[in-house]
């Protein structure tokens, strides 16, 4: 299928901080504060740095295998997990806060970008393997940061008396928002039906994992 694409400069989106825009633009003023700007050469340098700082891959493999235990996942995911045992495998990591209902589209963009970068790195450095890793930062935020989501012109706010790490919160009191979102969807449209199933089966259990796994 042919697709037309348009590249939009980060700065024109007005969705990123000046720090991020300057970093992507390789502003020399940032040089004293960073190790390197993103480039193929900097990726090669990072490979050499990581090779000098090995980790216990057996523990890494076991922990991630335990996290996936009992879940349905693709053969590619299984292959990637086993690749972690090799000293020639490196990870491309990205993370996101556990925003309700996935939060902004940027959540999906970050996952897609990590997958694409891992594939590009394999082309750049065919002697090595690269595994994209996405994880949720569930312990370092509060409800004020992640407790709302904008759908169209409406802002939905998680009304809860719970406190502490959001990753440990019970999602039962998201029921009113779930019902409001379900009312907006059409079960006769395949993509919308998929979202409805996610809301019904996941949110009220494992929505974020169910949403991100197919990506």
What are these regions (language model features)?
Residues 1-215:
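N-terminal targeting/trafficking signals and adjacent low-complexity tails
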């Amino acid at each position: 299928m042919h697709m037309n694409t348009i590249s939009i400069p980060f700065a024109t989106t007005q969705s990123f901080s000046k720090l991020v825009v300057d970093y992507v633009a390789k502003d020399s003023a940032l040089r004293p504060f960073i190790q390197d700007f993103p480039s193929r050469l900097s990726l090669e340098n990072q490979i050499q740095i990581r090779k000098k700082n090995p980790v216990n891959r057996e523990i890494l493999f076991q922990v991630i295998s335990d996290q996936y235990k009992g879940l349905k996942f693709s053969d590619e995911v299984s292959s990637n997990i086993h690749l972690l045992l090799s000293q020639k495998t490196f990870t491309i990591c990205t993370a996101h806060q556990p925003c309700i209902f996935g939060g902004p589209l940027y959540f999906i963009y970050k996952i897609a970008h990590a997958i694409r970068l891992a594939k590009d790195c394999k082309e750049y450095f065919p002697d090595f393997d690269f595994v994209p890793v996405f994880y949720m930062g569930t312990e370092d935020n509060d409800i004020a940061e992640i407790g709302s989501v904008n759908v169209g012109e409406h802002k939905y706010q998680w009304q809860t008396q719970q406190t502490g790490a959001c990753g440990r919160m019970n999602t039962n009191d998201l029921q009113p928002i779930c019902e409001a979102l379900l009312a907006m969807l059409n079960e006769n449209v395949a993509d919308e039906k998929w979202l409805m199933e996610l809301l019904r089966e996941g949110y009220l259990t494992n929505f974020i994992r169910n949403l991100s796994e197919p990506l």
